[in-house]
Amino acid sequence: MTPKALNSYFADFARAAANYDADAVAGALAVIMAPDATLHMCHPFGDISGAEFQATCLAPLHRAMPDLERRDLIFMAGSTPAVHDTGGQHWIGCCGNYIGTFLAPFLDIPPTGQLAHMRYHEFFRFEEDRIVEMQAIWDIPELMMQAGAWPLAPQLGKFLCTPAPMSGDGLAIEGDGQMALDSVISMLTDLCRFPGDPDPSVMRLEKYWHPRCNWYGPAGIGTGRGISGFRNWHQGPFLRGMPDRKLDAMGDLMSHWLAAGNYVCETGWPNMRLTVTGDGWMGIAPSGREILMRSLDFWRLEEGLIRENWVLVDLLDVYRQLGVDVFARLREFNKARVPGSIPLPDWRNA
């Protein structure tokens, strides 16, 4: 199945969701998504069927943002290579932002009455011309932070609306991606040399990462600039808190990869196993509890080096595994706020 064919199958849904039209989205999903498709959604949605996607996930978001838009920043389509999986599966990977005027509660997150954004990484597996599996993370903590409702530890990295690729070609990716894929796989292999070898130089970060790289992490971790920002605001605390990380192709862990031109993307449900020890992580005490992690990533290389890396981790599910109900804490923190929708005045009377 060619990237062009996958793109054509997906086009009606992408068009209907761009300026969200509920009827058009329903019609497109009826054609493209198998009713019994397995959809692995981030916490709190969990696993649902294809027939439930709109009612369970999209419709509540649309009610919260009546002028909802789904804006792809990166679009990749193709067949998985023989890297840690059998290869030959047909996937689409999308990175983008849902945006709209936040006028009604969403998952008990209080509305702001203003433009809001929520990053998504959505992966769709096709058999013939229908979606049979989806793996997706929505950056729900990003929406909580914009509402002033995030109930947990402050993030170390910077908060921002994640930008599109600097190169401007995220929706028109072409060419053979084998060199980019080989570089990313080698980079991840070298990352895993530490902390077994306690010298950080064994990761050879300068070999793989551009000196002006941007690491776009999820809300709760934040974004870092350059190798120093990557190390200080994400990787250092991450490895101190969970030094025993294990990646895909180990036991029940598995990733699926796409590569084209200067881009690589990966999805796995789950694709990491870790134990929270050492210093703890993100303000979480070191419980010694093993967790499974889902990390859905996109990389863009420039002159053979990683210039941009978009990462979403299902942090709400991480907290769930550690016994922290983020939504219960959110309700406690915000129960003095007036619930319900925000009626914006007519602009003629503003």
For each of these PLM feature ranges, what is it?
Residues 1-350:
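C-terminal and inter-domain tail/linker signature
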